[in-house]
Amino acid sequence: MKETIFNIGYDLITNEIPRGSRVLDLGCGDGELLAELRKKKNIEGFGIEISPKSVGIALSKGVFACQADIDEGLSDYKDNSFDYVILNQTIQNTKRPEYVLREIMRIGTRVIVSFPNFSPSEGT
């Protein structure tokens, strides 16, 4: 069930992003979403992930990813550096959500933020 919900989220995000966009995925994990966007939408993708192990997996998929803490490392990006910045089910893991949200609105022309549902209703 969890995988199905996650894939639905990927489909929703993929449908929003035009072909050839420049995309930054914050909390990119193993790079699965960026790999999917590259395959389906021919995007230029970059990922930031705090876990060195996940960065290694992303790199093995051919996804450009670097290890960094998004609570600290977004100020280096120039204004409107990306067409889209994605924060997919990651905001709850940040220590400074206000900073992160301000920064993604600065560095992305458009932003996509999703939140996990920690208490889904039964039967939906």
What residue ranges belong to the model's regions?
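Glycine-rich SAM-binding Motif I of class I
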Residues: G31-A35
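Class I SAM-dependent methyltransferase SAM/SAH-binding core
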Residues: E36-G73
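Conserved alpha-helix/loop element of class I SAM-dependent methyltransferases that forms part
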Residues: T4-G20
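Class I SAM-dependent methyltransferase "Motif I" SAM/SAH-binding loop
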Residues: G27-G29
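Short conserved loop adjoining the S-adenosyl-L-methionine
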Residues: G73-D79
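Conserved class I S-adenosyl-L-methionine
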Residues: V113-T124
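A short glycine-rich, Lys/Arg-flanked "PGG" loop and its adjoining helix->strand segment in the class I
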Residues: E98-I112
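A short SAM/SAH-binding and catalytic strip from SAM-dependent methyltransferases
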Residues: I86-K95
